[in-house]
């Protein structure tokens, strides 16, 4: 696992996404997992460089 540094705005957006999922009946733990996985995928794709 690795750390992802998020801006305050990105953190707020993640919280909103978690709250939206919870409003749809998803548990808080599962909502956090879903959003965290999405953030890791985005971060992983951002780290790729043409040299790889």
UniProtKB/Swiss-Prot annotation:
<protein>
    <recommendedName>
        <fullName>UPF0181 protein NTHI1697</fullName>
    </recommendedName>
</protein>
<dbReference type="InterPro" id="IPR005371">
    <property type="entry name" value="UPF0181"/>
</dbReference>
<dbReference type="Pfam" id="PF03701">
    <property type="entry name" value="UPF0181"/>
</dbReference>
<comment type="similarity">
    <text>Belongs to the UPF0181 family.</text>
</comment>
